[in-house]
Amino acid sequence: GLTLAWSNEDFVRTGYRVYASDDGVTFGPPINLGGHMHTFTDPNLPVGTERYYRVSVVGSGVESKPSRIYGARVGRTPSPVLVVDGNDRWSFQTSENPAGANHGFAALTGRSISGPAFDTVHHGAVISGAVPLSPHPAVVWLLGEESTADETFDAAERTLVANYLNAGGNLFVSGAEIGWHLDRASGPTAAERNFYRTVLRAAYVADDANTYAFVPTGAGI
């Protein structure tokens, strides 16, 4: 089976509602849980089954907007692939998200992973140590348009990622502002530049490539 876990938010609540989906788009009826519950287990799922979940809070007769959509595929433990959602800017900045809705970007990433089991986690759980990177052979780290204010990789994350890669891990990073945050002409610290250049092994050229098309190198993905 699969287990979904969420943090104990500091607000008045009478319960939670979990919604499950096979594709991250169409969700079934709510599964009602008590306000003291912070995990939900979807049991007896065969190997290879994919599920996507979102959670809402119930209190004072109203239901909150749903959480981000996270998914997983049943397989061996620990999962070969860990999807890390580091895209907070979209959720909290009005200019990025005028409707105030939560996102399903991590779910789309899960759907693109063909074959191996995967789990999805918020980057805060990686920072806290609740979900370590080390057991997973591959990590997909999503940053969207995270930049200087929200930070693409903060000091704690840089250390965790560097240690993971030095131990032989494999990392795929997706983000539009990583180079600007960590290696633009002025602003980044020496530690940020070092991480970008020697750990991520990237080279910052300009703030805008002026294209949405690219061709991978022969030895690339």
What are these regions (language model features)?
Residues 1-13:
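Conserved aromatic anchor
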Residues 28-36:
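Solvent-exposed serine/threonine-rich low-complexity stretches and specific carbohydrate-binding patches
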Residues 42-61:
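Beta-strand-rich modules
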Residues 146-221:
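A glycine-rich, often tryptophan-bearing local segment used as a flexible ligand/cofactor-contacting loop or short
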Residues 35-41, 68:
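Short S/T/G- and acidic-enriched coil/turn segments that sit immediately N-terminal to beta-strands
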Residues 6, 16, 27, 51-53, ...:
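Conserved hydrophobic/aromatic "anchor" residues
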Residues 12-29:
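Extracellular low-complexity, O-glycosylation-prone stalks/linkers
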